[in-house]
Amino acid sequence: MELAIGCDHGGYLLKQDILIWLEEHDIDFEDVGCFSTESVDYPVYAEKVARAVAAGECSKGIVICTTGIGVSMAANKVGGVRCALCTDCLQAEMTRRHNDANVLALGAGITGPNLAKRMVEIFLSTEFEGGRHARRVALVDSIQP
């Protein structure tokens, strides 16, 4: 599967907009929740996305909460996940190109739906450059708690 996507209640409406965009572009995805605006705990859904990516069940992931901060912190606790909180298109591009991020974090209270969909498009279509960046990503991946 290409993509796992999840959110808490604060990210639910933005996630719905992104799901429509994914369907319109025939992008295969797994929606791990949440499924309403009723209050839930963001780490649960960030972990579901992160584990799907780390296990190779999905090649990339998207996590959404109100700011994107909590879900990015939670996703990055899972080994093999490189989650980047992005607020603009340049960040979405460069986090793939130079950092090989495999999970995109979005803040629904920060980023509107049109910008978010453009960032998702860029994140999904941008390839990792490798080269000197691969060495740096390996250094990041080698850092242990």
What do these predicted ranges mean?
Residues 15, 42, 46, 71-72, ...:
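A general structural signal for well-ordered alpha-helical segments in protein cores
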Residues 45-63:
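Short, structured active-site "lid" loops
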Residues 63-64, 69-109:
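Mid-chain, well-packed structural core segment of small domains
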Residues 2-3, 58-61, 80-82:
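Short active-site oxyanion
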Residues 4-24:
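Glycine-rich phosphate/diphosphate-binding loop of Rossmann-like nucleotide-binding domains
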Residues 17, 21, 25, 52, ...:
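Alpha-helical structural signal in soluble globular domains
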Residues 28-39:
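A short beta-strand-loop structural module common to alpha/beta enzyme folds
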Residues 4-6, 10, 89-145:
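C-terminal binding/interaction regions
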